[in-house]
Amino acid sequence: MGIKGLTKVLAEHAPRAAVQRRVEDYRGRVIAVDASLSIYQFLIVVGRKGSELLTNEAGEVTRQETSLALPVSDHCIPAYLTFHLCELCSHLQGMLNRTVRMLEAGIKPVFVFDGEPPEMKKKELAKRSLKRDDATKDLNRAIEIGDEDAVEKFSKRTVKVTRKHNDDCKRLLRLMGVPVVEAPGEAEAQCAALCENHQVYAVASEDMDSLTFGARRFLRHLTDLGYKKSPVTEFDVSKVLEELGLTMDQFIDLCILSGCDYCENIKGIGGQRALKLIRQHGCIEEVLQNLNQTRFSVPEDWPYQEVRTLFKEPNVSAGISDFTWTSPDTEGLMGFLSTENSFSPDRVTKAVEKIKAARDRYSPGRLKHLTPVASLPGTHTGKEPKCILGSPGQSLKLINYCSSSSTSNAGYRYTVDLSLLAFKGLIS
């Protein structure tokens, strides 16, 4: 979620703190990327062409197949299956494509993954889980009545980034030769710490709380490469403070008062009113002292002081060395993407060629200021867990689906791997 209403507040009250940039402006720059948020976006932004990744060179699915009947409305099931078919590999497709495009632009990405969430965020995570449960119920109803648009909408609302998604992307990035950081806590906080320590030039994310954690430069839309034409928006935290007329401590209080992931906000106080109150009173303590208690109800035991400490002293690793971008592991990528995840071998080969070409084009000899000195350790180990989808089923690995000319309105027939499919109540 980030900080409620902060984008609008900055657009109105600190317009000069944000500038529009081209991707090319970051050529030669080391950028910390919030990986976990990117993966969520990859899972949400799913198109039909994502299913191409599950086929071989002849367009055929290579897994063991069998068939089953799904006794639901004919015209809505393709939307549901298409979404989850693409979802199975969309995190890998998105991570591969966007990382390649960043490397081709001369950007040196460092992907930072979430660790253990702070205790104060667990209430927000529980709320999100309940929303996914509600979306699953809505999805079931949409399937029953055959509402194709609703099936697609509610399918996306059931999406959750799993450990499997994260582990897959870490493995992919390491095979690509791109550094990975596993944060002990919030990825945004670790990104901000790397930026504050001058180990990276900027932080790329969509959550505005990167600024609250103290990132000197914050980039939005950088990971939209190849999907949107939006320019990159760069925020400079020093200009944010200057334009708003606040200290960093006051800015943190503004963000807490506006609403964040770590505590409830005061109902009726959004970003605009929060800015006015902080400018008038200077800190949350004084705001509460002068707040109209009959108009605004402060949550009981409101932990704003603990949240303030979390933003100022987050759980981050201070012992991270500088980074090295290595040559891609061609054999490893082919095995992981093509053999294990049914990517087209030609697609993998082209991606490797692009990575190598970008590495040659922006070699340390040409960009001397980027010469790294040490690499982050870590290799992928352990048995892969199944991908758990927020759907009427549990673990699911769709292989292919096709309509049968002899199938009646009672349902479609689809070719799937039954051993990994669990549509509760939907399999006849």
UniProtKB/Swiss-Prot annotation:
Coiled-coil zones: none
SMART domains from the UniProt entry: HhH2, XPGI, XPGN
Keyword Ion transport: no
PTM statement from Swiss-Prot or TrEMBL: Phosphorylated. Phosphorylation upon DNA damage induces relocalization to the nuclear plasma.
One Pfam family named in its UniProt record: XPG_N
Cofactor descriptive note: Binds 2 magnesium ions per subunit. They probably participate in the reaction catalyzed by the enzyme. May bind an additional third magnesium ion after substrate binding.
Enzyme Commission identifier(s): 3.1.-.-
Known cofactor(s): Mg(2+)
GO molecular function term, any single one: magnesium ion binding
Localization: Nucleus, Nucleolus; Nucleus, Nucleoplasm; Mitochondrion
Keyword line: DNA damage, DNA repair, DNA replication, Endonuclease, Exonuclease, Hydrolase, Magnesium, Metal-binding, Mitochondrion, Nuclease, Nucleus, Phosphoprotein
Region (N-domain): 1-132
Main location: nucleus
Residues engaged in binding Mg(2+) 1: 34, 114, 186, 188
PANTHER family: FLAP ENDONUCLEASE 1-B, FLAP ENDONUCLEASE FAMILY MEMBER
Subunit composition and interactions: Interacts with PCNA. Three molecules of FEN1 bind to one PCNA trimer with each molecule binding to one PCNA monomer. PCNA stimulates the nuclease activity without altering cleavage specificity.
Record's function text: Structure-specific nuclease with 5'-flap endonuclease and 5'-3' exonuclease activities involved in DNA replication and repair. During DNA replication, cleaves the 5'-overhanging flap structure that is generated by displacement synthesis when DNA polymerase encounters the 5'-end of a downstream Okazaki fragment. It enters the flap from the 5'-end and then tracks to cleave the flap base, leaving a nick for ligation. Also involved in the long patch base excision repair (LP-BER) pathway, by cleaving within the apurinic/apyrimidinic (AP) site-terminated flap.
UniProt name for this protein: Flap endonuclease 1-B
Organism in which the protein naturally occurs: Sorghum bicolor
